[in-house]
Amino acid sequence: LTETPYHYGTIGAPTDNYMMFRRNSGRFGMNMFYGEFNYRHSFTDRHFIDFVVGYNKWKGDNDNYYQDSTVYYNDAALPTDYSYQYRPMRMNSNAWEVKLDYENPITDRFKLQAGYNGRFSHENTPQESFLDGSSWNGDNVVEDRAYYNRFIYDMDLHALYATLSYNIGKFGVMGGLRGEYWRVNTESYSWEQEHDASKREPAFKKDYFELFPSLFLSYQITPTQQLQLNYTRRLRRPWGGQLNSFKNTSDATVISYGNPELTPEFSNSFSLNYLKTWTQHSLLVSAYYRPTTDVMQRINYQSSEDGLMYQTNFNVAKSTSTGLEMTAKNKLWRILDLTTSANFYYYKLNGFDFDIDGQTVSGEGNHNFTWNARMQASLMLPYDVSFQATGRYRSRQVITQGHSDPSYAVDLGLRKSFLNKKLVLAVNCRDLLDSHKRKSYTESEMFTRYQENWHGGRRVNVSLTWNFGNMKQKRRPQQNMENQEESFGSQYSGSEME
């Protein structure tokens, strides 16, 4: 439950013209099913083929209630206005993943790895709206067809890869190439288009084929020290919601919508690494340089037609990150594993300008020094019980048209194995302190905006897993859980980095 006052008037005036008070409440339910089949064919202990098929079905019922009361100060004759909105959204998503991995140590020095990865996902999510324009409690709600939307999203991904590694003396080299074909179709229906197929516009379709080379060079200084020089090309893809052109008015201060023209962003990563190992500890220090093109960022603008604030995503500019990352792993008293990482870097985002809504939207280049840290503690307890705690912190960072404030979060997990580890019960609490929110400040010549975004708040998840056969247990994917760390409707939302 949140209660927010909105003040409307002229800057510098002694009083507001009017004030709207909004109460927002809601409930969210989620059901998820995940199944996975693993098979390994071994030619020898080191020469094998792995085959994995996974299926994930996810449903979420999201009900939001908005109660508004508006008081007019500049005209005492006007009565207080009341309105009630109910907006249910039924999220439906399913996905298949197929993996085939081949590994063959041809000689003691030469190894071949190759494989295929396919992902096939489908989302069909209707959103409805019911309105009572004269009541606080919603006594006489009617269907509000202007805000109906059905979003359909289909994504197919096919990737083939091959890597060759060769070691001679203290030197090692590994080179690889991944070819990726990505296809996405999106459809967004209004109420009229939902009920009359002849009014629907053709699905928005796009596809890409890209090559991603990688090269890793290493030198073993001593048995416990190693130098590495690496290069990889990566991409980050937009997620479905960033491509939905439906204009969402649930926020009283801004109308947000997706951009079907949004394309992936690409990075070239160069790094020099130093690795030091001890019996129970290790330290990895990495200096890196990472230029990125077609950076996906969320931009704000005031419409020249209706004067309202709008928010959407664009491939705005180029960026560069130059920094130092350190990762330490420590095993203490045989029962406690600590993994600590810290990333210190200088971030530069270039300026941009483009035409939208009959006007030129621009942003100046910006830069700052920023850092983030993450610590994970895993504790092994008696009776096949394990406990895990994870803490994350991100400092202030520049974004398009402004900056985002620091943020932090804590997650907890408890795991218990039964029947010789065939049956596993896991309880996880995401965002224990209910602190995982994103605060951002943006401005231009036309506006100044401060925004806070939450993403579900504290959540508890209980899962029961049964393992059979001889395959080693693998971590089950979580529906968009990891990506939420950088989401909150920001330029990082739910995107995929590879």
What are these regions (language model features)?
Residues 215, 366-498:
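Conserved C-terminal beta-signal and adjacent last beta-strands/turns
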Residues 46-49, 109-112, 170-173, 224-227, ...:
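Repeated loop/turn-to-beta-strand initiation elements of outer-membrane beta-barrel proteins
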